[in-house]
Amino acid sequence: MSAIKKIHAREVLDSRGNPTVQVEVYTELKGYGSAMVPSGASTGSREALELRDKGSKFESNWFGGKGVMQAVENVNKLIAPALIGFEVTDQRQVDLAMKALDGTKNKEKLGANAILGVSLAVARAAANELDLPLYKYLGGFNAHKLPLPMLNVINGGEHASNTLDFQEFMVMPVGAKSFREALQMANFVFHNLAKLLKKHGHGVQVGDEGGFAPNFKSHEEALDFLVEAIKLSGYKPATSGEKAVAIAMDCASSELYKDGKYTFGKLKKAIEEKQPGFENLGKTKLVYTTDELIDYLDHLVSKYPIVSIEDGLAESDWAGFEKLTKRLGHKLQVVGDDLTVTNTELLAKAIERKAMNSILIKVNQIGSLTETFEAIQMAQMANMTAVVSHRSGETEDTTIADVAVAMNTGQIKTGSMSRTDRIAKYNRLLAIEEELSKASTFPKDVFYNLKK
């Protein structure tokens, strides 16, 4: 093995055309790794800090405060000198050294985007030097499980300019026997959904994550279209069984929460403005208490084949999450995203309070590969499922695909069947499945922690 010889960062663009950080790492024995950092739109308030240029000497640059040149400078002038000479395979020591150099709880000094870019690039450089695929370098010989994909085929919330308040409506091909088959099933549903939308006069424009973004009059309407698309594709809308396709939702309820109530603000605006088709919806319920929203979610679960609900309540509504998990946690995934932000301190609290039974894993929420792995391992030890996830602002970087296989998480959420920034991850997983061949497995019981 060899030492880190050079680290260089630059400003590049993500899938929304916003600046993000790219980092390259070079080793003494010609190992090379490059990584790009994703960015979220609906973010948890306790996430590690993504450093932008607003308020810095770079604010007047061409991105008007949204740039990341301060983070880039922090890599090139502060992090790089501190890490030159480190053994490239000492990932944990590298990550801990950056954490110490930053010295803050949420990485606000150097920026989580600066630290994460280096962390991921170091791992890639080590894998490159060893001539190993990244998943095998990270997970060793036991990295073998391909993940069941959650495909976000209808976008709403902060990810689309439409009337849907819940952020993501996803399909999960639970009846597939391989990753390739799962992707094929999802592809059929996606394209048949497009046909249905066109047939009923809806546009097929897409949101940030590649899903369609129609102006539906309710969440039920979105779910009805999904069920019909599944049937039209020749599959069964169900939570289990052969050729079954289930539904998952990300409510992103923190975005709906204010003064102790949940408001469907986008739908409310469409009704108040009397947008075409919304003129006669004045009696629609738009404001919910915690208990009422739990009742509403329970109603949806009883009516549709929903197997996973992410951020069903706001990040500060811990008591509500406890109630939701007690009510529905025996039959579906109650996924914490904003609630726990890939943070082991918050995850430990959620485990103690039984506030969820599944965690969403986003590498940029915590800001290093080491801390990401710690969160996955803590969840698995607590009999929770872990869902490796993209962000709405993505790049062609495919690291999360390798992470999902390396840690045998069994689930991945990385967008729809459009936009290259999403498809790149699926293509990477297809290549991994082919490379592993007979050594690969595909989860037969992905929801292993649910009581049968």
Swiss-Prot record:
Its main location: cytoplasm. It is found in: Cytoplasm; Secreted; Cell surface. InterPro entries: Enolase, Enolase-like_C_sf, Enolase-like_N, Enolase_C, Enolase_CS, Enolase_N. GO terms for cellular component: cell surface; extracellular region; phosphopyruvate hydratase complex. Binds a second Mg(2+) ion via substrate during catalysis. The keyword Cytoplasm applies. Belongs to the enolase family. Catalyzes the reversible conversion of 2-phosphoglycerate (2-PG) into phosphoenolpyruvate (PEP). It is essential for the degradation of carbohydrates via glycolysis. This is Enolase. It comes from Mycoplasmopsis synoviae (strain 53) (Mycoplasma synoviae). The gene is eno.
